[in-house]
Swiss-Prot record:
GO terms for biological process: defense response to bacterium. InterPro entries: Anti-LPS_factor/Scygonadin, Anti-LPS_factor/Scygonadin_sf. The keyword Disulfide bond applies. Disulfide bonds join C32-C53. Binds tightly to LPS and thus specifically inhibits the LPS-mediated activation of the hemolymph coagulation. It has a strong antibacterial effect especially on the growth of Gram-negative bacteria. The keyword Disulfide bond applies. This is Anti-lipopolysaccharide factor. Keywords: Antibiotic, Antimicrobial, Disulfide bond. Pfam families: Anti-LPS-SCYG.
Length: 102
């Protein structure tokens, strides 16, 4: 099933990977935000990732992973998956965004 949607998430992650724990990002013409917070779960460091675009949609991508980059990647994947399922992002928009980072 992945294909273009996985590529879209990865293109977005490439852009966010250079950024630190939180910030703003333009995605398909919308102001979006991401945040990564460290936490301890079962005596191990984990990172909670969140990606959201409040001026565009109420969808929020979330993930908890053992690395900061993993938390960003999986919260973005979660957002893209929800946005695709709700019809918020078209395949054409995804391809246009991806082409900027190839």
């Amino acid at each position: 099933e992945g294909g273009i949607w996985t590529q879209l998430a990865l293109a977005l992650v490439k852009n966010l990977a250079t950024l630190w724990q939180s910030g703003d990002f333009q995605f398909l013409g919308h102001e979006c935000h991401y945040r990564v917070n460290p936490t301890v779960k079962r005596l191990k460091w984990k990172y909670k990732g969140k990606f959201w675009c409040p001026s565009w949609t109420s969808i929020t991508g979330r993930a908890t992973k053992s690395s900061r980059s993993g938390a960003v990647e999986h919260s973005v994947r979660d957002f893209v998956s929800q946005a695709k399922s709700s019809g918020l992002i078209t395949e054409k928009e995804a391809q246009t965004f991806i082409s900027q980072y190839e």
